[in-house]
Amino acid sequence: MKNAKQKICTVLASCLTLLPLSACNGDNGDVKTVQINEVTHSVFYAPLYLADALGYFEEENIKIELTNGGGADNVMSAVLSGDADIGFCGPEAALYVLIGGSSDVPTVFGQLTKRDGSFLVSRVAEPNFTWENLKGKEILAGRKGGVPAMTFEYILNEHNLKDGVDLTLNYNVAFNMMTSAFETGTADYCTMFDPVAYEYEAAGKGYVVASVGEASGEVPYTCFMAKNSWIERNETTAEGFLRAVTKAVKYINETDAATVAPYLLAYFEGTSETSIAASVQRYRDIDAWRTNLTMTETSFNRLQDIIENAGELSRRATMNELVNNTYADKVYNEIYND
């Protein structure tokens, strides 16, 4: 996490005197192009893409442009530098900026996913998998200090398994390179998001043995965040953005996965409709998405428990230092009280 913190702080220091290009793109009634930097690209984030595909963003005079940051540290760097208007990643990235003492901390204004969306993949079939099966094994866990790795370690500790004692967590492979490293022989297990996990298993390369999210419980896993200066200039856009995504969550929860899948095809080039539908259903089965895109204090505190357990938290924060639920609450009440 130290390298991630240093990277974020360096970017922050270098951009304090720069005015983001989006600064002149206030709420003036025209179509707003919103630059979104996402931590990775997955069906786990289907409501975001559906809000675009179903025209919900268009209804709010918003056009989105997506960039895959390949990690929360990169997403946060893009937000701090002004290269992205909205960062879409784990809130730990903003928490690290806060506890680092910065006065320019991005605000979390919406939470899409409420648990880990990865699945544990084994090289061999384990129909009766238990966490004790991991004893003596090596697992590709992701970037140290990132929520995926810390959540996984938290689950292991809950099952009395310790890294370096009972098993080995491999933090040496970049998040977006884990699957290819696993395929070429690194480690005994790997965590993967859908549709990658589904297609990996369908190709006979491995076996999904557990849902990490089901084991971890609810945590604020992936959130929308932006600099306060951007939110203040673009309140209508921020609210409209959440309105569109909230509508998309409602749609995906009320619609058969096979009906949803065709709308997502354009966002997952080379992925089959069958794979997308199966992934949507799997995420629905684990109750992955927030209906109201607010963050709860209980889940925020669990996130800090997870980070603290990993030895990566120098002090705890209060939720109101980092989170503004106002816009999410407003659009939820509009949509569900109509």
Where are these regions (language model features)?
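Pocket-lining segment of extracytoplasmic ligand-binding domains
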Residues: 176-268
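Bacterial N-terminal signal peptides that target proteins for export
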Residues: 1-11
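C-terminal motif of bacterial Sec signal peptides marking the signal peptidase cleavage site
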Residues: 20-23
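Stable alpha-helical elements in mature extracytoplasmic
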Residues: 44-47, 53, 72-75, 90-93, ...
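Bacterial signal peptide processing site
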Residues: 25-27
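Conserved C-terminal helix/tail region of periplasmic/extracytoplasmic solute-binding proteins
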Residues: 301-338
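Secondary-structure end/capping motifs
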Residues: 232-315
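Short, glycine-/small- and polar/acidic-enriched structural segments
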Residues: 29-162, 168-172, 188-194, 205, ...
